[in-house]
């Protein structure tokens, strides 16, 4: 089994699913996108379209966890500043795409959560693992936060707000709406800081704007 060919199939499927959605992406589309000779070659690597879709989702979250979420764990940087940098980086990614693709996890959730239990349960885990990392960050920042700040609820709120903001900006094809909601999210978090409100724009955000 050729690992490069397998990766080609996953890459083609990920691109097509992001552009069209899972339902409108056929095995034939993936075969053409990956440059395969036919269905026998596809089924040599994946037993079904469903199995391929699961692996695409798993691989996308692995990348997000190992690259996108690493800023939340940057040593030597205060936790709330790390959160601001993460938000700024997420906004920058979607601005670079003109807010046309959306989030692969949010897209699949909207498309399949009512129709496909296998995908629904996997996407639920994706959001839970993302929120868990944010919860750890808020727990680390607990001495900066007001006494009644709930790390778990703040983490879930951040995930829900960012996913909603990405969806709205995709519908409007307007990066400014994403930036505005991200700034409002930072202000909301700032309301939970003892005696001060952190800057809306972090070091990473200032660098992005330059």
Where are each of the predicted segments found?
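Hydrophobic alpha-helical connector segments
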Residues: 55, 69-101, 147-158, 205
């Amino acid at each position: 089994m050729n690992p490069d060919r397998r990766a080609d199939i996953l890459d083609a499927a990920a691109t097509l699913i992001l552009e069209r959605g899972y339902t409108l992406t056929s095995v034939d589309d993936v075969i053409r996108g990956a440059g395969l000779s036919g269905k026998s070659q596809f089924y040599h690597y994946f037993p079904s379209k469903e199995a391929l879709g699961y692996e695409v989702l798993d691989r996308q979250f692995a990348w997000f966890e190992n690259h996108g979420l690493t800023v939340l764990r940057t040593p030597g940087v205060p936790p709330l500043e790390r959160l601001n940098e993460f938000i700024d980086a997420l906004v920058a990614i979607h601005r670079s795409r003109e807010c046309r693709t959306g989030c692969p996890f949010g897209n699949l959730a909207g498309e399949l959560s009512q129709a496909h239990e296998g995908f629904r349960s996997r996407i639920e885990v994706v959001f839970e693992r993302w929120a868990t990392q944010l919860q750890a960050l808020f727990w680390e920042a607990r001495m900066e936060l007001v006494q009644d700040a709930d790390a778990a609820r703040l983490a879930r709120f951040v995930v829900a707000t960012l996913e909603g903001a990405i969806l709205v900006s995709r519908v409007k094809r307007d990066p400014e709406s994403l930036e505005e909601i991200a700034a409002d999210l930072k202000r909301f978090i700032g309301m939970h800081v003892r005696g001060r409100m952190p800057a809306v724009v972090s070091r990473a955000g200032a660098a992005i704007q330059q």
